[in-house]
């Protein structure tokens, strides 16, 4: 059984953001503008995305 995936794209710059927001971006595997990453859809990943609605968008 395959795990459900979620695809996200970074739309906000980490420059002049609080350190905790930059760490969350790094934890999601992002760091540069317009990069996309595909992650396993878990409650932990969803929570990280919910903390950064102004910096990431869900594609899939």
UniProtKB/Swiss-Prot annotation:
One GO cellular component term noted in the UniProt record for this chain: cytosolic large ribosomal subunit
Alphabetized InterPro entries for the sequence: Ribo_uL30_ferredoxin-like_sf, Ribosomal_uL30_bac-type, Ribosomal_uL30_ferredoxin-like
One GO term of the biological process aspect: translation
Pfam name, any one: Ribosomal_L30
Keywords, comma-separated and alphabetical: Ribonucleoprotein, Ribosomal protein
Molecular functions (GO terms): structural constituent of ribosome
Family: Belongs to the universal ribosomal protein uL30 family.
Subunit structure: Part of the 50S ribosomal subunit.
HAMAP family recorded: Ribosomal_uL30_B
Record protein name field: Large ribosomal subunit protein uL30
């Amino acid at each position: 059984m395959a795990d459900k995936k979620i695809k996200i794209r970074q739309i906000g710059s980490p420059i002049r953001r609080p350190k905790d927001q930059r760490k969350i971006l790094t934890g999601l595997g992002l760091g540069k503008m317009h990069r996309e990453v595909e992650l396993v859809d878990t409650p932990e990943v969803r929570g990280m995305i919910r903390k950064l609605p102004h910096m990431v968008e869900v594609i899939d």
